[in-house]
Amino acid sequence: MLNRRSFLQSAGLAAGFGLRAAAQTTRPQSPDTAVPASDVQVPRTKFAGAEISRLVVGCNPFYGFSHFNRILGTVMREYYTPERVCEVLHQCARFGINAYNYVGLGRAGQDLARFQAEGGRMHLIVQGMGGPETIVPLKPLAVYHHGEMTDQAFDQGRMETVKDWCKRCRDAGLFVGVGSHRPNILEYVEDRGWDVDFYAGCVYNRTRPAAEWKRVLNGEALEMPQEVYLRSDPPRMYEFMRRTPKPCFAFKVLAAGRIEAEGADAAFRQAFSSIKPIDGVFVGMFPRVSDEVRENAERVHRILTSA
């Protein structure tokens, strides 16, 4: 996985890096029946009536959500032209990654339409940021209430609005879940028996209230408190995911790119050894310096097939 600090130092040296190959144009029948183009295929699990890869491609790098700083976010947006977004999605499909953690912001809808017009197919697991009327036309496999919006609702005592959103999605015929960055919020939903099908949990607690940070750090003030990643956090989210019988997706398992090389192997191994066989992970790909799609697909394949 790319070390984003090192990348910022070397970006100028790699400015001429180009796209390796054009997108595939053969139209497969569905994400489940696409003919693999690589010997390495990410293992799958059943979810929402389909078979999906346990590694799901994330969308954050596509649209500059670096969770690092404005500079890296800008570099990501400049790199990820519509052509490159589609190429990465096609490459994911060649490695058996057939699910996409989609968010309907900016030009994401146009990029998805282009990918599909080129013959690409992905099961969409949508980050829900609008009403079901904006989600149903996408024909998603599933949708979940966006994690930061869930956390804000919890802090403001408005969890009934999240429950109502889930009900409206259910009434619209959607397979529905709840996302959060805090295991205690997902426990809140689980303990109250909400009518939801699955959970999406950030393994690092990025949305700690200021008062909690003061307790954790003995009153120290932080720069960018929502981008601090504590090593003690992942086991807490993984514990919740093991305990619930519902499918779960873990995200930010690489601490938004802060974990690399051997550390990435360990992070993926920790994730898959800590969650259930019906669970998966969302991981964004930024192949600006190295072939992260291949690296991550091979890593997950190796971990899951040798278990």
Question: Where would I find each of the regions flagged by the language model?
Answer:
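Catalytic alpha/beta core domains of metabolic enzymes, predominantly
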Residues: 179-270, 285-289
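C-terminal segment of N-terminal export signals and the immediately downstream linker at the start
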Residues: 21-56
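C-terminal helical cap(s) of enzyme catalytic domains, especially alpha/beta-barrels
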Residues: 290-307
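Conserved, mostly hydrophobic/aromatic
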Residues: 57, 176, 248
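Active-site-adjacent beta->alpha loops and helix N-cap segments on the catalytic face
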Residues: 105-115, 151-165
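Acidic (Asp/Glu)-rich catalytic clusters
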Residues: 112-119, 132-139, 240-243, 271-276
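N-terminal secretory signal peptides and thylakoid transit peptides that target proteins
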Residues: 1-14
